[in-house]
Amino acid sequence: MQYQSTRDKNLKASSAQAILNGLAPDGGLYTMPSFDEVKFDYTTVLNMDTMSMSTKILSKLLPDFSEAEMAKLVHDGYTGKFETDHLTPTVPVGEDFILELFRGPTSAFKDVALSMLPRLMTASKEKLGVDDEIMILTATSGDTGKAAMEGFCDVPGT
């Protein structure tokens, strides 16, 4: 499956290329042409633990990575960084449920994505034969910069 730019569907990239590029050359975002291309039975993940669920879903959405490769990336990205093995537990509040997105290292919901991004970027680099180190520059007044720096901290190749 090739990802395509939101501004020009003829600009395509593999999932590894899209991860490393971030944006398409025309400034568009990379998206799948159609979710129909991803055949996925969501009932298979309903009773999985968070790590297994993350592995299964991400390996379907990012086909350049095998399920075994993704399992290692998920393990390395999340293990020991969150207050609970569930990462973002769903807790009952009366008759409702709340998804707690503040259990990561910086208490920001962005920890979920930014704990995986450096692992995905370094693995994409290897797949594409890129030798350059990854440099992240942040300028923010909010929690994004802190979450990004925490996610990339001590990750080899960054």
Q: Which residues make up each language-model segment?
A:
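PLP-dependent amino-acid enzyme catalytic core
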Residues: 1-158
